[in-house]
Amino acid sequence: MTEHNVRNFNINFGPQHPAAHGVLRLVLELDGEIVERVDPHIGLLHRGTEKLIEAKTYLQAIPYFDRLDYVAPMNQEHAFALAVERLTGTQVPIRGQLIRVLYSEIGRILSHLLNVTTQAMDVGALTPPLWGFEEREKLMVFYERACGARMHAAYFRPGGVHQDLPHQLVEDIGNWIDPFLKTVDDIDELLTGNRIFKQRNVDIGVVSLEDAWAWGFSGVMVRGSGAAWDLRRSQPYECYSDLEFDIPIGKNGDCFDRYLIRMIEMRQSARIMRQCVDRLLGDAKIGPVSSLDGKIVPPKRGEMKRSMEALIHHFKLYTEGYHVPAGEVYAAVEAPKGEFGVYLVSDGTNKPYRCKIRAPGYAHLQAMDFLCRGHQLADVSAVLGSLDIVFGEVDR
């Protein structure tokens, strides 16, 4: 009988692969169809964001955050704005807080819709992406009507938001919620009980809670493993402590649980949006949307036409920028993908001394090897989809 030497087979997954979600390159070591080792190669979208921010004023740094997780841009600006507000001791008026929360939840729905529907597409269901992108298009229009940009908004500024929302826009967002919940039910009906979708996701990429903490997971990745850890509830910021919403948790920690959690979170986000819309049309119908302290937020156009001092303030804020007191602060928000944190070090000048960005996707991607070992090659794209990776924030 002849002896056969069996050696493992190496293949490249990406960077041009449609299921690689951007510019991911995985080097996979396969034993037949079984994955023995996964080696993610990142950095193909590295732009040196953290270094670039050090050469910009605090206001000029905001657009960099839109370009990290470009699926839900405003959630990242939120963390940076919170960090600057904590260092400067700025208070955001309630109408500004409600608008921020409203648009953060729109961002969460944008991200989850993209993730749930493209994950369905990765395992072969082609209808959900078409339905999901129809709703995302409407949300993009709400972004555009608030600030003029569909994606890179630069709308959340330290001190509040850039400009007020028209009443008609708030009403339109309120009218959008119920038809959207119907769409979520349709996607739910198509996928949740679907035999093929279940076979591709149940018991794939299982993470125990201990492993989730050890790998530095956050967001849906820990909630899928059974911990009710959500920064909106555990470390409330803005007016989340006044709003009612539930935190869904899974019990198996597999791809299917994470999918179910994202579906429920979209419904909870719609519930939060409903509360914000009611208050923006009710007790917070009129009022300032950004801090009235003129040292950070530029004066209104009308004031500039009347007062020389306002004009000087405006000129100084947009040329030199404001000086932030020396100190360091960590501000984190519950972004759609997990805990998005900004560690900001100020040396008292008009530019950040250091701005460290803690992207959730980075911690999730490092566990690809741990998650995919022993699974089949076809499951790699299912695991990758359930991690919800966007390369802007991983490579930054």
Curated annotation (Swiss-Prot):
GO cellular component: plasma membrane
UniProt keyword list: Cell inner membrane, Cell membrane, Membrane, NAD, Quinone, Translocase, Transport, Ubiquinone
Subcellular location: Cell inner membrane
Family annotation (Gene3D superfamilies): Cytochrome-c3 Hydrogenase, chain B
Top-rank EC class of the record's enzyme: translocase
UniProt main location, coarse: membrane
Domain of life: Bacteria
Catalytic reactions of this protein: a quinone + NADH + 5 H(+)(in) = a quinol + NAD(+) + 4 H(+)(out)
InterPro entries attached to this UniProt entry: NADH_Q_OxRdtase_suD, NADH_UbQ_OxRdtase_49kDa_CS, NDH1_su_D/H, NiFe-Hase_large
Pfam families linked to this entry: Complex1_49kDa
Quaternary structure note: NDH-1 is composed of 14 different subunits. Subunits NuoB, C, D, E, F, and G constitute the peripheral sector of the complex.
Function, in words: NDH-1 shuttles electrons from NADH, via FMN and iron-sulfur (Fe-S) centers, to quinones in the respiratory chain. The immediate electron acceptor for the enzyme in this species is believed to be ubiquinone. Couples the redox reaction to proton translocation (for every two electrons transferred, four hydrogen ions are translocated across the cytoplasmic membrane), and thus conserves the redox energy in a proton gradient.
Family: Belongs to the complex I 49 kDa subunit family.
Protein name: NADH-quinone oxidoreductase subunit D 1
Source species of the chain: Rhizobium meliloti (strain 1021)
